[in-house]
Each structure stands twice: as structure tokens, then as C-alpha cells.
UniProtKB/Swiss-Prot annotation:
One of its GO terms (biological process) is semicircular canal morphogenesis. Residues 1-17 form the signal peptide. Detected in long bone (at protein level). The gene is sparc. Gene3D superfamilies: 3.30.60.30, EF-hand. This is SPARC. Residues 68-90 form the Follistatin-like domain. GO terms for molecular function: calcium ion binding; collagen binding; extracellular matrix binding. PROSITE patterns: EF_HAND_1, KAZAL_2, OSTEONECTIN_1, OSTEONECTIN_2. Ca(2+) binds at D271, D273, D275, Y277, E282.
Length: 300
């Protein structure tokens, strides 16, 4: 999986790098060996939400076994131990017991601007801070060691959603072209992307440069509506409630920040009412989608 995420992040870096500036070095992912979880989303830059999910607190129990911990699953940052009555329970993992990272790509930066050796170290530390103000504020910020992120200027921020929107459209077209028997898209999604794909083939001889992104968005506006809805649906998973939390955004924003310095400001300003959640209407507005074109039924 490490190789897969490394490949897709490279792909995303190439697709998203701002043409007016040098691409930031790609400082990749946070991967630890955890039980396989159901894949969330099919966006190739979107890292499995399980890697960053701070909100799923279920501790599942199955049939008793010799070792009660074998079938007792704990969330990230916790490990299973048994008490005096041989009952399994989840306790915070000691960060010193985490495996040593093997490269820079395993390091992550927290919102405390501290570099953690791996996701294991980060979540174990966060667990020990549960119930404290510091722990409540601590989240995974981005993949790779902490580094200087240049401020996002107003003119750069205005271009960012156009570039991301164009990229989302291209991601969907690519999935459609590769989706013969892979079930990357469901049937309803394929029907919506089919028209976008046909239009893309017609326009493939002309691809927009940065200064032409606005013109392309205005001219081909209808081609951007579904990709924006689709990406929202890919992220809105825990729970599926029509709102994106910081945790739900992490699979997309964490790989982007080292490559796109406007990522944090963009998502912060998407939260128009500043309630720490991004509703579909706020998300669509951030990408320039008109209010009358926002449709919950488009998230299929």
C-alpha cells in the first residue's frame, strides 16, 4: 500500500502543482500496518480515511477466544490489554512502543507544528492527551515533516478552487476510462461522467493554462458540477450526514498541504459559518458552483 499511495501522491503533485511557482517537494504518507478497512472513496490522491480517522471510536467484540484481545479492535492510538478478570479493554499505546519509521515519507506534521515519526506515534500521543485542551486541539495537519508553508495570497486563493475543480474533473474522467470491470464508479456515476468524458474528448486539443482557468470554468461550467458533488460524497463517510469534519477532510487535505500551500486557507474559508463543519452548500460555493445547482441527490 505504501508504494500505491506514493504513486498516487506523485500523480496528484504533477496534476495540482501551480504553474506559476515551483512544485513543493512531495513529502508523503502516513502508513502503519492496521487491519484492512473498507475503502472510502476512489479519488487516487485521497488516502484511506482509516489512516487519519480520529472520530471512529467503536471497540468491536466478537466470539471469545483464548486471547480475548485477538478479536477486540481498538481505534488508532490504543492497544488492547486484559484486566484482572481477563476482560479486554483498550488503553493508550505508549509512543515508545511504536515501530521506528523507515523514511521521511512516514513522518507527519501535527497541528501543534510538531513532527511525529509516524501515524502510530501521533495517535498514541493524541490518546495520552485525551480529555485535555491540548488533546482536543491536536489533529493531523499534513503528511511529511513539518516545514515552512508560505502564506496563501489572495490572488493564489482565487485560482486554487479552479485548479482543484479541474483536477477533480480529470480524476473522474480517468476513473471512467479505466473502469471496465473494476467497479471504480457505480452505474449512476458512470452515466453522469459519460457526458463529461465525451466533452473532454471534444476539448482535448485545448487544455487550459493557469491564466485560462477562469475562462474554461465559465465556458464549461456544467462539467464541473458533478465532480464537486462527487468529491464531497467521497469524504462524507463518518458519519454520512451532509457535513465534512476536520477528520473527514484529512484524507484529501493532508496529502495536498505540502504541495499546495493554499490548502489550509481554502478549507478554512469554506467553513463560512465557522462551525468547524463544511456543509454541502458551503463546499459547492467554495468551488464556484451556483446555489441553484447544488443537489444532494447528485451525491450517489
Amino acid at each position: 500500500m505504501r508504494v500505491w499511495v506514493f504513486f498516487v501522491l506523485c500523480l496528484a503533485g504533477k496534476a495540482l502543482a501551480a504553474p506559476q511557482q515551483d512544485a513543493l517537494p512531495e513529502e508523503e504518507e502516513v502508513i502503519e500496518d492496521v487491519p484492512a478497512e473498507e475503502t472510502v472513496g476512489t479519488n487516487p490522491v485521497q488516502v484511506d480515511v482509516g489512516e487519519f480517522d480520529e472520530a471512529i471510536n467503536e471497540e468491536e467484540e466478537e466470539e471469545p477466544s483464548e486471547n480475548p484481545c485477538l478479536n477486540h479492535h481498538c481505534k488508532h492510538g490504543k492497544v488492547c490489554e486484559v484486566d484482572e478478570s481477563n476482560t479486554p479493554l483498550c488503553v493508550c499505546q505508549d509512543p515508545s512502543t511504536c515501530p521506528t519509521s523507515v523514511g521521511e515519507f512516514e513522518k507527519i506534521c501535527g497541528t501543534d507544528n510538531k513532527t511525529y515519526d509516524s501515524s502510530c506515534h501521533f495517535f498514541a500521543t493524541k490518546c495520552t492527551l485525551e480529555g485535555t485542551k491540548k488533546g482536543h486541539k491536536l489533529h493531523l495537519d499534513y503528511i511529511g515533516p513539518c516545514k515552512y508553508i508560505a502564506p496563501c495570497l489572495d490572488n493564489e486563493l482565487s485560482e486554487f478552487p479552479l485548479r482543484i475543480g479541474d483536477w477533480l474533473k480529470n480524476v473522474l474522467v480517468s476513473l471512467y476510462e479505466r473502469d471496465e470491470n473494476n467497479n471504480l464508479l457505480n452505474e449512476k456515476q458512470k452515466l453522469r461522467v459519460k457526458k463529461i468524458h465525451e466533452n473532454e474528448k471534444r476539448l482535448e486539443s485545448w487544455r487550459p493554462h493557469s491564466e485560462l482557468l477562469v475562462r474554461d470554468f465559465e465556458k464549461n461550467y456544467n462539467m464541473y458540477i458533478f465532480p464537486v458533488h462527487w468529491q464531497f460524497g467521497q469524504l462524507d463517510q463518518h458519519p454520512i450526514d451532509g457535513y465534512l469534519s476536520h477528520t473527514e477532510l484529512s484524507p484529501l487535505r493532508a496529502p495536498l498541504i505540502p504541495m499546495e500551500h493554499c490548502t489550509t486557507r481554502f478549507f478554512d474559508e469554506c467553513d463560512i459559518d465557522d462551525d468547524k463543519y463544511i456543509a454541502l452548500e458551503e463546499w459547492a460555493k467554495c468551488f464556484g458552483i451556483k446555489e441553484q445547482d447544488v443537489d444532494k441527490d447528485m451525491i450517489v
